[in-house]
Design a protein with these regions (language model features):
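A domain-level signal for the mature, folded cores of soluble proteins
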Residues: 1-23
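Acidic/polar N-terminal loop/beta-strand segments that form early-domain functional surfaces
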Residues: 6-9, 30-32, 269
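Solvent-exposed loop/turn segments at secondary-structure junctions
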Residues: 11, 34-35, 84
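Short, solvent-exposed loop/turn elements at domain surfaces
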Residues: 13-14, 36-40
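Extended, Lys/Arg-enriched charged tracts that mediate electrostatic binding to polyanionic substrates
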Residues: 18-37, 45
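Sequence context surrounding c-type heme c attachment/ligation sites in exported
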Residues: 42-294
Length: 294
């Protein structure tokens, strides 16, 4: 659940298709799991449910990004068991959770990032870059949302009609990775962009890997096709290439997505479980790639 608040009398500006938020802006992201009638925490969420009733969900944490005069600051809050109050946890925290699904129970530890770990993703230009939002940007606020009074509007257009943004964007909208009707490659690259591009970009902390997944490079070698690892260590799974066309099970990229080991898994922050839907998508994309690495 994401929210955006802009101080009264202030506006965000669209400059070169990028949103510049005013001082005092607060962006929140609340993490939760759905619950059943018995109060058990469930693994699957109903993505078709656009209006969220938090009373039917187990709330875990809320992360805030606050715009200051010269920078963004991040604040992780953890909710109490009664879900009546959230407490600031600058040093991070851990929450044991039991999830129920059709395949049985899943026990795991939910890790809340500390303040410094927030910058691990939200500083996309290293080493001297500043923290900034990843989701509340012009190219990502393009989903249609059902607002009150039967009003369906793109999120970024709603910011304009509300008076929170100076003008609409002229840029193109990315394909949603969930859109089954869209091109498979476009969906896969969109998924890799939002999951990996904050690090795997020409100026990011993973730039030395030469694996560029933020959409800025279209050469197959930059996407990992037949590219040997630079510093994967044990994360390579004794495989030779990041992506082997037609062979997802021999591709390091998918191996690391499937792993939950701390020194292997990708993304390395922000998850404790394996994202089966994303793995299925990337596996299908790699499986239909033509060519070979021999």
């Amino acid at each position: 659940l994401r929210t955006l608040w802009i101080p009264d009398g202030s506006q965000a500006r669209l400059i070169d298709e990028e949103i510049e938020y005013p001082v005092g802006t607060v962006i929140s992201k609340t993490f939760y799991y759905p619950t059943n009638a018995e109060g058990h925490v469930l693994k699957q969420i109903d993505l078709a449910e656009r209006q969220i009733d938090l009373s039917r969900n187990k709330i875990i944490e809320t992360r805030l990004m606050v715009r200051r005069d010269a920078r963004w600051d991040a604040f992780p809050y953890v909710w109490n068991k009664e879900e009546t109050e959230a407490f600031l946890r600058i040093a991070g925290s851990s929450v044991p959770i039991n999830l129920k699904s059709d395949t049985g129970d899943h026990d795991f530890v939910y890790f809340v990032p500390n303040e410094n770990q927030c910058s691990g993703c939200h500083v996309t230009s290293h080493p001297a870059g500043d923290m900034h939002p990843l989701g509340a940007i012009a190219t990502q606020l393009t989903a249609a949302f059902d607002y009150p009074k039967n009003n369906t509007e793109l999120q970024i257009d709603k910011l304009v009609t509300r008076g929170w943004l100076t003008k609409k964007t002229n840029g193109s909208s990315p394909v949603s990775w969930r859109d089954e009707a869209a091109n498979l490659e476009a969906r896969a690259l969109s998924y890799l962009n939002i999951q990996c591009g904050h690090c795997h970009n020409p100026e990011g902390p993973a730039d030395t890997s030469s694996l560029i997944l933020d959409g800025s490079h279209k050469f197959l070698i930059n996407l990992g096709v037949c590219k040997t690892p630079v510093a994967a260590g044990g994360g390579s799974g004794d495989m030779l290439y990041s992506i082997v066309p037609g062979a997802p099970d021999r591709s390091i990229l998918l191996y690391r997505m499937r792993s939950s080991e701390l020194d292997e898994m990708m993304p390395e922050l922000g998850r404790s479980l394996i994202h089966s839907e994303g793995i299925s998508l990337i596996s299908r994309w790699i499986g239909q790639l033509p060519g070979s690495c021999s």
